[in-house]
Amino acid sequence: MRVVVVGGGIGGLALGSGLRRAGVEVSVFERDTDVRATGGYHITLDGPAQEALSGLVAPEIVERMLASGSALRLRDPDAFWDRRGRVLGYGPELRDDPSLDIDRITLRALLAEAVGDDLHLGKVATGVGYAGDGAPVVWFDDGTSVTGDLVVGADGAHSLVARFLAGGPTNAPAGIVGFSGRTSVNDLSAGERARLGTRSGLVVGPHGAALYLGFLDPVGNAVLDRPELRSPVTTGPTFIWGAMFPDSAVTGALRKLRGSALRAALVARFRELGWRPEVLEVIEAADAESVAAFRFNAASSRAGELAPWPAGRITALGDAVHATPPTAGMGAGAAIRDAADLVERLGSVPLPPAVEGFEAAMRERGAAVLTAAMGPVRWILFTDTVAGAALTVAAAPVLAAAARWRGRR
Ligand SMILES: Cc1cc2nc3c(=O)[nH]c(=O)nc-3n(C[C@H](O)[C@H](O)[C@H](O)COP(=O)(O)OP(=O)(O)OC[C@H]3O[C@@H](n4cnc5c(N)ncnc54)[C@H](O)[C@@H]3O)c2cc1C
């Protein structure tokens, strides 16, 4: 059997590696010319995603991932703050949480290594369909084409392959625009370092303004303490933050800015919405080059609406099918689990039923991940309603007082 994979992001590379290990002939075609010259911050891999990965890549690659990953169990519980910097509550203890955060570039580079010379870079797919003999075929912008027994679209949220199968887009804008950046903890004032601690957190204010802070330290909090195996992009305690606003003319104007101009405009926008300066220091201290905008796209959270096509010899996985906003940190993990499931089925079930079973399981998995990710999105959008804004403002002092009282006990 020969499998053609379109897209060498996280899901496509995980699939390529798994098929190669299983002895299946596979070729992964990716439009980027360098897997490291790509955007992205950190990816969270929970226990099931790590378990899936350990079946897809060789043990030495798993070890290098663990040596480059930041362990959640070494972090303090997540915090919820208000826009004045008051603590409203804490999340659960993380000491038994097996999840890790890893730089997207590091994860992608390690997966690319696992795929080896079955990865073909600089190949832009421009069309997909069936040849006269019924074999699936992919066409590229350089005039070449390739056929296989199975074509898998792992080409992300704007997937060409899934659009061919579904007859249209498989997701839509979720109503929120995100702006991310990277801030070294060493660039924060002593006061702010003490206030934030070694924890991730979320601030949600009225009018749909929210700020996520993700703490990672792949060196100090390494999952596996093997410095000789380490290859993270992040080399010290760092906050990867995501500012979120409802999609509007204001965010449209922000999206046109870059670097320090965007960073300053984000701070100004939060200040207009009543946020205290100390809460915004993490944005002000960010590496200007790291600040970038991205739009949240989401597929349906109803399983029956995902992969709305009959099973055949062309399929898709990951964001191509269940594009997931980053609010639950589960999109990449779901793509990896899709890949592991497809590899397993292709090894034990003949082709048409293998794809049918794979797509049925992926619908359930995708819907579960989307349900988790859309909770925070809906909450943030609710604060942009008159009732939601009033409730957010009224609840903050009550929750802050309750948190102080619990702290005193
Ligand atoms: C640049 C980038 C940065 C990201 N940063 C983060 C992040 O910081 N945190 C986070 O949680 N998630 C991030 N994500 C999303 C996360 O990586 C995905 O949600 C998740 O990995 C799902 O994996 P996937 O393989 O389905 O899609 P992706 O990882 O998006 O991979 C899709 C791949 O297909 C390729 N492709 C698309 N169209 C074609 C074509 N026509 N021909 C050939 N190749 C094509 C793309 O170049 C891409 O490499 C990012 C995604 C991208 C593309």
Segment roles from a protein language model:
Residues F294-L317, H322:
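FAD-binding beta-loop-beta segment adjacent to the flavin cofactor pocket
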Residues D46-L165, T170-R182, S260-V267:
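Conserved N-terminal helical subregion
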Residues M1, V62-M65, P77-G89, L280-A285, ...:
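C-terminal helical "tail/cap" subdomain of flavin- and related membrane-associated enzymes
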Residues R20-G39:
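Glycine-rich FAD pyrophosphate-binding loop
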Residues M1-G11:
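Beta1/beta-strand and adjacent pyrophosphate-binding region of the FAD-binding site
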Residues V87-D103, S180-A288:
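Conserved FAD/dinucleotide-binding core of flavoprotein oxidoreductases
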Residues G11, D34, H158:
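Conserved Rossmann-like nucleotide-cofactor binding loop
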Residues T33-A52:
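Conserved N-terminal glycine-rich FAD pyrophosphate-binding loop of Rossmann-like flavoproteins
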